[in-house]
């Protein structure tokens, strides 16, 4: 075996230099044989592969074409002529003779800007174009020395979520070479298409453009242009791009799409893009909407406003020869068909536009006269009760024979009275005669008018009113839409809130014996279609329709909900309610016995009956918190109920003293007396051990040196004051609770329909009467109930718990799950914890809050005389987890389980058309009697006005509907007085008498020395939220939906700004 010599670094360096010389010699030999050297290959690290292990002498192929049967690499130098000839025809051709060595020439290629440039071969790129070629430009299939006419400059888009609404526009050369090859991992390499022909994008945009991504979110096509949408991440940042795709393959056919999962973005797609795409139609509609709003604002600002008080002077009418009253000629009023009501008015054969001469109060239906002449004897146009009259003012009777009126143009005979009117008198109470109709005192046109009090006589003109027509008033396309009366026929009886409708009246809804009329975008569109030649109607329809179209587009593109189109159709098409003859009427009936309402027939609630199976559950006595105390201007010698008998009530003190887990505390204020056993402060160290040596007591003795002795005023500073407090949970002798279980409950509503009795339940909510069928919306039955019959201080009250208790679950400690004694002497549940007593000064900020659970606060009160002081005691909640207290009963029960939250809905079906009247005045003499925080219904009584049903509301809460006359009902009020009652839109204030909550609430009583207070039941925010969890949940959902819609719109505008001005 030959010996081996170790290789040193110097030997390795020599070997590498020798190999480099050999490679350069091979390159020079290849150049002498007219073979072009390979251009330098610069590819991104993310798309380049490993070239190790490849045969350096064999043909080199691109990584994207590796293993795909392609022997040619068109991304590098073009092949020799023989290979080009072989590619053009399958027949072999003889090889040409070797040419003499020459310098290789770079090929010419298209730049996309009408010229050509040499392709770089060796050395690093010197400009952005050379760098793009080095990154992977593929020349066309034909001769690279010629221009490629198919190459063009196209645009792709990129944007990043991390940079906000910043869009990047990438302009690049694109050759229609078909689908680009795939990499080894099956991904499409976009770097093969990257060859910018515009400004060079930033480096991070180029990196994102060349990032491989196999997920195609959608394929977009416009004309012959095709784009692929992708989203991916680069360095933790999410990017999106729209890449231009080739449209023709190698053989001229349509190029196939990348072999990945693709989808067409539409409403039926299960995958939704993250952004909203706006195109030209949306921008065009938005611009039209802004233009419409601007035009509408300009029209509203330029529209003239009429002065109702002093109308403009009319133009002078043409003279006409008429009857002679002395030496004067009359000027007849020429009333045309285009008056304020759109009717046809005629006086003789003369016509004139009355809207130019009639004053503004014509619209109100009141009296009004307008003089067309300045003479003492002249003609007037009078108006009253929505009728126009032709009147003549005169001082003496006219001739007995009529005179024909002859105009200048032709001779016609005007319509004149058959009988001359009798003379007029100055008295206002006189009349002009039987054949005269409607004329009366003149209304002053101006303040200086001297015709005050003169009687006007004349003849009634013929008035033919056209059919009633409606229009819609727009408010930028948003609800509510108002109905505008264009023409009104009085006999149709259209009213707005009980007031007759006139031309020009605007109202959300009109009511008549024929039915109801409302307005909606559908009606405006119908009017615009029917009046296609009217610019106003077309403009109104456009302004009403465009916002809904935009909302539909936003919802469809942003939310991608399948039901958006159906919901929009329902809103647009189902909001129109044309007037028609109704065959059914709907109203409400309050749920208190005695309530009545008026459908086509009167309906009255005679009573409510409750049916169930009852099982007795026994009786028990609940725990009750009781406290007492005393304020004394000296230290007592005996701190007990017997020793403090002069200051503390004996009976409560003994009951509390004998209770379990009592708390007894004695405080001494300024204990520096000149005599007795309280001379030193050391007597009052914690626990009061020294004090107990002289005064045996069961109370805890504590010093209170920081408190003021001002309660015992009028004494020197060494005055001593003591405070004594005692509290415990006791069995109240006058409070018992009896339990009854109700199963198979059913509520029976007893109704009287036009004198016919009828009972309705949830199983049978119909009443068949001779007048028609009445369907009642009966609330569901409450189900199983638990009744708590509470007796206290001679007053009995029942509370109802919904549902059966789960005695084997969380309700095991509830009163209904205990074994009760028949005599109500057993206390249920565990013994409560000991109350905590606390001495609080009168100016302590702590008094602004409520006592905590199980706490009792005592505060000295200055007396009205010297050495007289009182004590104010405040108690908090019970402060333990047991559920047998009255607080638990009130929190888990209700006073009326079968009382629904709202009135009963009544639907009366009849074959005759119906129209429900409506109250036109506020209710009178309404009185409210009750307690608004006791959980019991209050009594509401008063007088309902005439004119129809009175939907009574008390402080905004509907308490039922009543016919005209006296009504008495019960309502659960949650607000304190004053009470505002309304009916038919008219409101008034009711008188109220509030009952003390102490007499109605089932709560414990706190006893004091001079001041007796009631333990206040305060509701915390958590308790209020627990009681209104459904409303809060619904409100939160609505708020989230609204916030999402606003955020979506904001996002649309944000990214739309970036798309309009890309970088």
UniProtKB/Swiss-Prot annotation:
GO terms for cellular component: host cell Golgi membrane; host cell mitochondrion; membrane; T=4 icosahedral viral capsid; viral envelope; viral nucleocapsid; virion membrane. Residues 30-69 are annotated as: Human C1QBP/SF2P32-binding. Changing residue 664 to S: Prevents E1-E2 heterodimer formation, and subsequent transport of to the plasma membrane. Complete loss of fusion activity in vitro. Changing residue 1057 to S: 98% loss of virus production from infected cell. One of its GO terms (biological process) is virion attachment to host cell. Residues 59-69 have a biased composition (Basic residues). InterPro entries: Rubella_Capsid, Rubella_Capsid_sf, Rubella_E1, Rubella_E1_1, Rubella_E1_2, Rubella_E1_3, Rubella_E2. Gene3D superfamilies: Rubella membrane glycoprotein E1, domain 1, Rubella membrane glycoprotein E1, domain 2, Rubella membrane glycoprotein E1, domain 3, Rubella virus capsid protein. Structural polyprotein: Contains two internal signal peptides that are necessary for directing translocation of the glycoproteins into the lumen of the endoplasmic reticulum. Residues 70-87 have a biased composition (Basic and acidic residues). It comes from Rubella virus (strain M33). The chain crosses the membrane at residues 535-555, 1029-1049. Changing residue 686 to G: 99.9% loss of infectivity. No effect on virus assembly. No effect on fusion activity in vitro. Residues 93-107 have a biased composition (Pro residues). Residues 18-34 have a biased composition (Low complexity). This is Structural polyprotein. Changing residue 1053 to A: 90% loss of virus production from infected cell. Residues 556-582, 1050-1063 are cytoplasmic.
């Amino acid at each position: 075996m030959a010996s081996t010599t170790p290789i040193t670094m110097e030997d390795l360096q020599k070997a590498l230099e020798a190999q480099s010389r050999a490679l350069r010699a091979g390159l020079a030999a290849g150049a002498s044989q007219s073979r072009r050297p390979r251009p330098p290959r610069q590819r991104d690290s993310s798309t380049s592969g490993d070239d190790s292990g490849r045969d350096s002498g064999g043909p080199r192929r691109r990584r994207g074409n590796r293993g795909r049967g392609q022997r040619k690499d068109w991304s590098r130098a073009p092949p020799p002529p023989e290979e080009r000839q072989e590619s053009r025809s399958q027949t072999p051709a003889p090889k040409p003779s070797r040419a003499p060595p020459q310098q290789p020439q770079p090929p010419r290629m298209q730049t996309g800007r009408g010229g050509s440039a040499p392709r770089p071969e060796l050395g690093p790129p010197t400009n952005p174009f050379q760098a793009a070629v080095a990154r992977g430009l593929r020349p066309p299939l034909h001769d690279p020395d010629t221009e490629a006419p198919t190459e063009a400059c196209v645009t792709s888009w990129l944007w990043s979520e991390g940079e906000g609404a910043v869009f990047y526009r990438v302009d690049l050369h694109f050759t229609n070479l078909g689908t680009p090859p795939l990499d080894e991992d099956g991904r499409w390499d976009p770097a093969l298409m990257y060859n910018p022909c515009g400004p060079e994008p930033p480096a991070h945009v180029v990196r994102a453009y060349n990032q491989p991504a196999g997920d195609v979110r959608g394929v977009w096509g416009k004309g012959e242009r095709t784009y692929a949408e992708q989203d991916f991440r680069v360095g933790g940042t999410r990017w999106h791009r729209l890449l231009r795709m080739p449209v023709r393959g190698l053989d001229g056919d349509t190029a196939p799409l990348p072999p990945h999962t693709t989808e067409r973005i539409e409403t039926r797609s299960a995958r939704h893009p993250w952004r909203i795409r706006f195109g030209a139609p949306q921008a065009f509609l938005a611009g039209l909407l802004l233009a419409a709003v601007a035009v509408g604002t300009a029209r509203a600002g330029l529209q003239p406003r009429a002065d109702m008080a002093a109308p403009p002077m009319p133009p002078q009418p043409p003279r006409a020869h008429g009857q002679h009253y002395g030496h004067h000629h009359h000027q007849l009023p020429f009333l045309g068909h285009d008056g304020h009501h759109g009717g046809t008015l005629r006086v003789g054969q003369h016509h004139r536009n009355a809207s130019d001469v009639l004053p503004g109060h014509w619209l109100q239906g009141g009296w009004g006269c307008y003089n067309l002449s300045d003479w003492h004897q002249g003609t007037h146009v009078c108006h009253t009760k929505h009728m126009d009259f032709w009147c003549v003012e005169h001082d003496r009777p006219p001739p007995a024979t009529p005179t024909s009126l002859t105009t200048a143009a032709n001779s016609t005979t005007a319509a004149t009275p058959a009988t001359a009117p009798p003379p007029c008198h100055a008295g206002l109470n006189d009349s002009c005669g039987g054949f005269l109709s409607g004329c009366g005192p003149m209304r002053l046109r101006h303040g200086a008018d001297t015709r005050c009090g003169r009687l006007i006589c004349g003849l009634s003109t013929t008035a033919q009113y056209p059919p009633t027509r409606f229009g819609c008033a727009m408010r930028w396309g948003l609800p509510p839409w108002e109905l505008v009366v264009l023409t009104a026929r009085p006999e149709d009886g259209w009213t707005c809130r009980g007031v007759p409708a006139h031309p020009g009246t605007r109202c959300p809804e009109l009511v008549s014996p024929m039915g109801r009329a409302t307005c909606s975008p559908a009606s405006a569109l119908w009017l615009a279609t029917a009046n296609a030649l009217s610019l106003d109607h077309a403009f109104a329809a456009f302004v009403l329709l465009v916002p809904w179209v935009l909302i539909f587009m936003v919802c469809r593109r942003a939310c991608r909900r399948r039901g958006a189109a159906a919901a929009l159709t329902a809103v647009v098409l189902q909001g129109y309610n044309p007037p028609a003859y109704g065959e059914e009427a709907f109203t409400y009936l309050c749920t208190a016995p005695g309530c009545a309402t008026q459908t086509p027939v009167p309906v009255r609630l005679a009573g409510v009956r409750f049916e169930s199976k009852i099982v007795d559950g026994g009786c028990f006595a609940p725990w009750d918190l009781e406290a007492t105390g005393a304020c004394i201007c000296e230290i007592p010698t005996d701190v007990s109920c017997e020793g403090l008998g002069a200051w503390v009530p004996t009976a409560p003190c003994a009951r509390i003293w004998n209770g379990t887990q009592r708390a007894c505390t004695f405080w001494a204020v300024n204990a520096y007396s000149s005599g007795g056993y309280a001379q030193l402060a050391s007597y009052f160290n914690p626990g009061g051990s020294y004090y107990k040596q002289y005064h045996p007591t069961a109370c805890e003795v504590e010093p209170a040196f920081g408190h003021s002795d001002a309660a015992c005023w009028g004494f020197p500073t060494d005055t001593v004051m003591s405070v004594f407090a005692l509290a415990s949970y006791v069995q109240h002798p006058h409070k018992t609770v009896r339990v009854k279980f109700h199963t198979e409950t059913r509520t029976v509503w007893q109704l009287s329909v036009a004198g016919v009795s009828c009972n309705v339940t949830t199983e049978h909510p119909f009443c068949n009467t001779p007048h028609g069928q009445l369907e009642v919306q009966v609330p569901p039955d409450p189900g199983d109930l638990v009744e708590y019959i509470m007796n206290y201080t001679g007053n009995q009250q029942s509370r109802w718990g919904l549902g059966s208790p789960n005695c084997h679950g969380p309700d095991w400690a509830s009163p209904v799950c205990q074994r009760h004694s028949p005599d109500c002497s057993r206390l249920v549940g565990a013994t409560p914890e000991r109350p905590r007593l606390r001495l609080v000064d009168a100016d302590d900020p702590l008094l602004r809050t409520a006592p905590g659970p199980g706490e009792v606060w005592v505060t000295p009160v200055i007396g009205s005389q010297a050495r007289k002081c009182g004590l104010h005691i405040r108690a908090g909640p019970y402060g333990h987890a047991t559920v047998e207290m009255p607080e638990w009963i009130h929190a888990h029960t209700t006073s009326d389980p079968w009382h629904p939250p709202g009135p009963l809905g009544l639907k009366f079906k009849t074959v005759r058309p119906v129209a429900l009247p409506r109250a036109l005045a506020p209710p009178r003499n309404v009185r409210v009697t009750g307690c608004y925080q006791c959980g019991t219904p209050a009594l509401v009584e008063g007088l309902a006005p005439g004119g129809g049903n009175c939907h009574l509301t008390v402080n905004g809460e509907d308490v039922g509907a009543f016919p005209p006359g006296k009504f008495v009902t019960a309502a659960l009020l949650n607000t304190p007085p004053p009470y505002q009652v309304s009916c038919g839109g008219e409101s008034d204030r009711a008188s109220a008498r509030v009952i003390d909550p102490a007499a109605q609430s089932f709560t414990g009583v706190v006893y004091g020395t001079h001041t007796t207070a009631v333990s206040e039941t305060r509701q915390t925010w958590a308790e209020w939220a627990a009681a209104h969890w459904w409303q809060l949940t619904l409100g939160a959902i609505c708020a989230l939906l609204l916030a999402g819609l606003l955020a979506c719109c904001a996002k649309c505008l944000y990214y739309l700004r970036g798309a309009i001005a890309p970088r």
